[in-house]
């Protein structure tokens, strides 16, 4: 029903559907879905790693039959890369995931196409560079924010997300990877719309709603860094190549507007969504 609803409201966009992979999935169902071309990739969340992951996987190493199935059928595996344990520091979860889960995964399933989504650390950048069957997506907010902007003078709940925003050292590594044009890194917004009442509250939801200004922020980042020659690689080419997708050669031009008045909130039902934006300048389609 959800797939039908999305397609009904689609406007000339190729929608790549993913399944929520966990230990309750049946291989027979996956076979039938592949036969009917119902999904493109599988997404795996560790249990309780982030918002809406209460049906996630407790022990990845017990999922071998699913990884074998994905590998055999050339289905990409997309990962939220955090090791979840009650004693783990939230700032160490991504590094520990590389050590305990991902190292095992790439070693035992060498032909499985893996995407480590929304990476946040230098450790992940180095890991992706050193392994052949894996690439990574990077979000706008993890490129542009760090612990100083998130937790510095004031706590900004609108920047609270999972994996949590890291230090300048890690931010610098993410920026270097994105701006370099390296084919193993590409844009992934991980945009998560949560109502204002659920963000500015005692126990706020994890997620940054970046959709409205993501492309503008990425354009300004590459422009101000004098790396526009690598912009298309990060935004379109690298991701398409990783997933073996054709990309449209049509060019879109943008114009830079200085001191643009940004819309902080977007009304939604009886509440509003908090739009993420970093720069004062804005890029609009020409």
Residue ranges and their predicted role:
Residues 15, 42, 114, 190, ...:
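Conserved, mostly hydrophobic/aromatic
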């Amino acid at each position: 029903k959800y797939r039908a609803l999305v397609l009904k409201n689609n406007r000339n966009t190729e929608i790549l559907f993913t399944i929520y992979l966990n230990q309750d999935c049946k291989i027979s169902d996956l076979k039938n879905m592949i036969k009917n071309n119902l999904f493109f990739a599988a997404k795996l969340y560790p249990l309780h790693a982030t918002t809406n992951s209460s049906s996630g996987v407790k022990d990845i190493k017990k999922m071998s039959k699913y990884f074998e199935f994905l590998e055999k059928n050339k289905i990409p595996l997309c990962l939220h890369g955090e090791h979840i344990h009650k004693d783990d520091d939230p700032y160490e979860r991504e590094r520990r995931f590389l050590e305990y889960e991902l190292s095992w995964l790439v070693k035992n399933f060498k032909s499985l196409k893996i995407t480590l989504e929304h990476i946040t650390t230098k450790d992940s950048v180095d890991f992706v560079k050193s392994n052949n069957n894996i690439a990574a997506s990077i979000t706008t907010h993890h490129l542009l924010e760090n612990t100083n902007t998130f937790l510095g003078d004031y706590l900004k709940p609108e920047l609270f997300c999972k994996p949590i925003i890291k230090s300048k050292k890690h931010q610098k590594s993410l920026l270097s990877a994105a701006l370099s044009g390296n084919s193993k890194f590409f844009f992934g917004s991980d945009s998560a719309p949560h109502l204002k009442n659920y963000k500015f509250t005692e126990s706020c939801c994890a997620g940054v709603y970046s959709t409205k200004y993501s492309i503008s922020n990425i354009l300004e980042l590459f422009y101000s860094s004098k790396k526009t020659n690598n912009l298309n690689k990060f935004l379109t080419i690298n991701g398409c190549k990783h997933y073996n997708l054709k990309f449209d050669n049509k060019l879109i031009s943008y114009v830079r507007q200085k001191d643009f008045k940004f819309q902080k909130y977007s009304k939604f039902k009886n509440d509003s969504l908090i739009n993420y934006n970093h720069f004062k300048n804005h890029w609009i389609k020409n």
